[in-house]
């Protein structure tokens, strides 16, 4: 069980093309083929295999909020959620005169429930604070272990 001092999220940040998304997809594939004991009942001898990592881009989540609220709610409550390219989505949108911030709402919800969340982003900590505000940035600092990927773009040819 997570304590107030343990981190239950992971942020992979760095330049474009350095393998953040590839690493999360590899984690997703590994996790999806492994069998794990039920974390809610450690005495249970039976392994369950219905665990998975739900993987969506921040833009997909943003659009789900407006177009398929039931699916957005499932993403909010999924055990492990991976959000790719945080920061590429619009910050908010207006519907019937009301302003909504889907990613802030989702991340705050997952923070409050201590749900494991994996994020890839090109944004620095300072840029996350500027885009999402102090409240969410502070929650990120508390819930997320940050891994800064090397400044190598694997999509472009490397010179020796």
Language model region names:
Residues 10-12:
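Hydrophobic anchor at the beta1->P-loop junction of P-loop NTPases
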Residues 23, 27:
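Hydrophobic positions on the alpha1 helix immediately C-terminal to the Walker A/P-loop
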């Amino acid at each position: 069980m997570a304590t107030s001092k343990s981190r239950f999220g992971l942020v992979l940040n760095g330049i474009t093309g350095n393998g953040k998304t590839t690493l999360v997809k590899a984690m997703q594939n590994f996790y999806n083929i492994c069998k794990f004991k039920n974390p809610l009942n450690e005495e249970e001898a039976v392994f369950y295999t219905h665990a998975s990592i739900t993987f969506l881009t921040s833009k997909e989540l943003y659009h789900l909020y407006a177009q398929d609220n039931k699916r957005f709610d499932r993403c909010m409550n999924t055990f492990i959620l991976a959000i790719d390219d945080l920061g590429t989505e619009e910050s908010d949108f207006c519907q019937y005169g009301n302003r909504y911030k889907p990613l802030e709402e989702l991340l705050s919800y997952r923070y409050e429930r201590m749900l494991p969340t994996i994020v890839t982003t090109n944004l620095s900590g300072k840029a996350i604070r500027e885009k999402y505000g102090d409240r969410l940035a502070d929650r990120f600092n508390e819930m997320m272990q940050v891994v800064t990927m090397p400044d190598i773009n694997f999509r472009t040819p490397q010179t020796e």
